[in-house]
Protein backbone atom coordinates (compact mmCIF):
# COMPACT_ATOMS: atom_id res chain seq x y z
CA UNK A 1 0.00 0.00 0.00
CA UNK A 2 1.16 3.50 -0.81
CA UNK A 3 1.25 6.32 1.73
CA UNK A 4 1.07 10.05 1.19
CA UNK A 5 1.36 13.19 3.30
CA UNK A 6 -1.42 15.77 3.54
CA UNK A 7 -1.93 18.79 5.75
CA UNK A 8 -4.91 21.08 6.15
CA UNK A 9 -3.87 24.72 6.06
CA UNK A 10 -4.65 27.31 8.79
CA UNK A 11 -7.63 28.74 6.89
CA UNK A 12 -9.20 25.27 6.73
CA UNK A 13 -9.12 25.00 10.52
CA UNK A 14 -10.38 28.59 10.93
CA UNK A 15 -13.30 27.87 8.59
CA UNK A 16 -14.21 24.66 10.46
CA UNK A 17 -13.73 22.44 7.40
CA UNK A 18 -11.58 19.71 8.99
CA UNK A 19 -14.29 17.05 9.05
CA UNK A 20 -15.55 17.90 5.58
CA UNK A 21 -12.10 17.55 4.03
CA UNK A 22 -11.10 14.38 5.90
CA UNK A 23 -14.41 12.68 5.07
CA UNK A 24 -13.74 13.17 1.35
CA UNK A 25 -10.49 11.23 1.66
CA UNK A 26 -12.18 8.47 3.63
CA UNK A 27 -15.02 8.20 1.12
CA UNK A 28 -12.38 7.50 -1.54
CA UNK A 29 -11.18 4.52 0.48
CA UNK A 30 -8.07 6.11 1.96
CA UNK A 31 -7.11 5.09 5.47
CA UNK A 32 -5.73 7.58 8.02
CA UNK A 33 -2.63 6.02 9.59
CA UNK A 34 -1.36 9.17 11.36
CA UNK A 35 -3.11 12.40 12.33
CA UNK A 36 -2.32 15.38 14.54
CA UNK A 37 -3.02 19.08 15.00
CA UNK A 38 -0.02 21.33 15.49
CA UNK A 39 1.36 24.76 14.78
CA UNK A 40 3.93 24.36 12.01
CA UNK A 41 7.32 25.76 12.97
CA UNK A 42 9.33 27.93 10.63
CA UNK A 43 11.93 25.14 10.45
CA UNK A 44 9.29 22.62 9.33
CA UNK A 45 7.91 25.09 6.77
CA UNK A 46 11.38 25.77 5.35
CA UNK A 47 12.04 22.02 4.97
CA UNK A 48 8.63 21.39 3.42
CA UNK A 49 8.90 24.18 0.86
CA UNK A 50 12.69 24.20 0.31
CA UNK A 51 12.25 23.71 -3.47
CA UNK A 52 10.53 27.13 -3.63
CA UNK A 53 13.25 29.06 -1.78
CA UNK A 54 14.06 32.27 -3.63
CA UNK A 55 10.70 32.49 -5.41
CA UNK A 56 8.57 35.59 -4.82
CA UNK A 57 5.81 33.67 -3.02
CA UNK A 58 8.18 31.77 -0.68
CA UNK A 59 8.23 34.13 2.34
CA UNK A 60 4.49 34.95 2.25
CA UNK A 61 3.76 31.21 1.99
CA UNK A 62 5.90 30.42 5.04
CA UNK A 63 4.25 33.25 6.98
CA UNK A 64 0.79 31.90 6.12
CA UNK A 65 1.42 28.22 6.90
CA UNK A 66 2.97 29.10 10.28
CA UNK A 67 0.21 31.60 11.18
CA UNK A 68 -2.13 29.13 12.90
CA UNK A 69 -2.85 25.49 13.57
CA UNK A 70 -2.70 22.86 10.85
CA UNK A 71 -3.86 19.25 10.76
CA UNK A 72 -1.17 16.92 9.42
CA UNK A 73 -1.93 13.37 8.34
CA UNK A 74 -0.64 10.35 6.53
CA UNK A 75 -3.11 8.57 4.28
CA UNK A 76 -2.72 5.04 2.97
CA UNK A 77 -4.27 3.18 0.07
CA UNK A 78 -3.72 1.96 -3.46
CA UNK A 79 -2.18 4.80 -5.51
CA UNK A 80 -2.68 7.12 -2.51
CA UNK A 81 -0.68 10.03 -3.98
CA UNK A 82 -2.67 9.99 -7.21
CA UNK A 83 -6.04 9.55 -5.47
CA UNK A 84 -5.40 12.46 -3.09
CA UNK A 85 -4.25 14.74 -5.93
CA UNK A 86 -7.46 13.91 -7.82
CA UNK A 87 -9.67 14.59 -4.77
CA UNK A 88 -8.05 17.93 -3.93
CA UNK A 89 -7.92 19.34 -7.48
CA UNK A 90 -5.54 21.81 -9.11
CA UNK A 91 -3.44 24.17 -6.98
CA UNK A 92 -5.33 27.27 -8.15
CA UNK A 93 -8.93 27.05 -6.90
CA UNK A 94 -10.09 28.96 -10.00
CA UNK A 95 -8.72 26.16 -12.19
CA UNK A 96 -9.81 23.29 -9.94
CA UNK A 97 -12.85 21.30 -11.01
CA UNK A 98 -16.04 21.76 -9.03
CA UNK A 99 -16.46 18.80 -6.75
CA UNK A 100 -12.79 18.86 -5.74
CA UNK A 101 -11.76 20.17 -2.33
CA UNK A 102 -9.97 23.19 -3.77
CA UNK A 103 -12.69 23.81 -6.34
CA UNK A 104 -15.34 23.94 -3.61
CA UNK A 105 -13.51 25.60 -0.71
CA UNK A 106 -10.29 27.21 -2.00
CA UNK A 107 -10.01 31.00 -2.00
CA UNK A 108 -6.58 31.74 -3.50
CA UNK A 109 -3.54 29.73 -4.57
CA UNK A 110 -2.08 30.18 -1.07
CA UNK A 111 -5.38 29.71 0.78
CA UNK A 112 -6.29 26.61 -1.19
CA UNK A 113 -7.27 24.51 1.85
CA UNK A 114 -4.80 21.65 1.64
CA UNK A 115 -1.24 20.63 0.80
CA UNK A 116 -0.59 17.15 -0.54
CA UNK A 117 2.55 15.39 -1.69
CA UNK A 118 2.93 15.26 -5.47
CA UNK A 119 4.96 12.03 -5.66
CA UNK A 120 5.72 8.98 -3.51
CA UNK A 121 9.30 10.27 -3.07
CA UNK A 122 8.12 13.68 -1.85
CA UNK A 123 5.57 11.95 0.39
CA UNK A 124 8.34 10.06 2.23
CA UNK A 125 10.34 13.25 2.74
CA UNK A 126 7.31 15.29 3.85
CA UNK A 127 6.07 12.59 6.25
CA UNK A 128 9.49 12.59 7.95
CA UNK A 129 9.25 16.34 8.64
CA UNK A 130 6.07 15.93 10.71
CA UNK A 131 5.92 12.32 11.93
CA UNK A 132 8.19 9.80 13.62
CA UNK A 133 7.67 6.23 12.46
CA UNK A 134 6.33 5.43 15.96
CA UNK A 135 3.37 7.75 15.27
CA UNK A 136 2.21 5.77 12.23
CA UNK A 137 -0.41 3.18 13.18
CA UNK A 138 -0.79 -0.01 11.19
CA UNK A 139 -4.32 -1.44 11.42
CA UNK A 140 -7.03 -2.99 9.29
CA UNK A 141 -10.32 -1.40 8.34
CA UNK A 142 -13.47 -3.49 8.73
CA UNK A 143 -13.56 -3.80 4.96
CA UNK A 144 -10.07 -5.31 5.02
CA UNK A 145 -10.92 -7.93 7.65
CA UNK A 146 -11.21 -11.52 6.49
CA UNK A 147 -14.29 -13.32 7.77
From Swiss-Prot:
Name the chemical reaction catalysed here.
Answer: a 2'-deoxyribonucleoside 5'-diphosphate + ATP = a 2'-deoxyribonucleoside 5'-triphosphate + ADP; a ribonucleoside 5'-diphosphate + ATP = a ribonucleoside 5'-triphosphate + ADP
Enzyme Commission identifier(s): 2.7.4.6
**Gene3D superfamilies in the record, alphabetically?**
Nucleoside diphosphate kinase-like domain
Give binding positions for ATP.
Answer: 9, 57, 85, 91, 102, 112
Q: Which co-factor is required?
A: Mg(2+)
| Protein task | Major role in the synthesis of nucleoside triphosphates other than ATP. The ATP gamma phosphate is transferred to the NDP beta phosphate via a ping-pong mechanism, using a phosphorylated active-site intermediate.
Quaternary structure per UniProt? Homotetramer.
Which Gene Ontology molecular function entries are recorded, alphabetically? ATP binding; metal ion binding; nucleoside diphosphate kinase activity
The molecule here is called: Nucleoside diphosphate kinase
Q: Where does the protein principally reside?
A: cytoplasm
Look at the named UniProt entry and state the broad enzyme category this protein falls under.
transferase
Instruction: Output the Gene Ontology cellular-component terms.
Output: cytoplasm
Q: Does the keyword Lipid biosynthesis apply?
A: no
Residues at the active site: 115 (pros-phosphohistidine intermediate)
Localized where?
Cytoplasm
Mind giving the lineage of the organism this protein is from? Bacteria, Thermotogati, Thermotogota, Thermotogae, Kosmotogales
Q: Which GO terms describe its biological process?
A: CTP biosynthetic process; GTP biosynthetic process; UTP biosynthetic process
Provide the alphabetized UniProt keywords: ATP-binding, Cytoplasm, Kinase, Magnesium, Metal-binding, Nucleotide metabolism, Nucleotide-binding, Phosphoprotein, Transferase
Amino acid sequence: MERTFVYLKPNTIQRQLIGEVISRFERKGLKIVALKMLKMTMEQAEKLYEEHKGKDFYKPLLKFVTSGPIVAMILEGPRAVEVVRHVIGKTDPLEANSGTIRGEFGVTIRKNIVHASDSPEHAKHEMSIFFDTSEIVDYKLLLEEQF
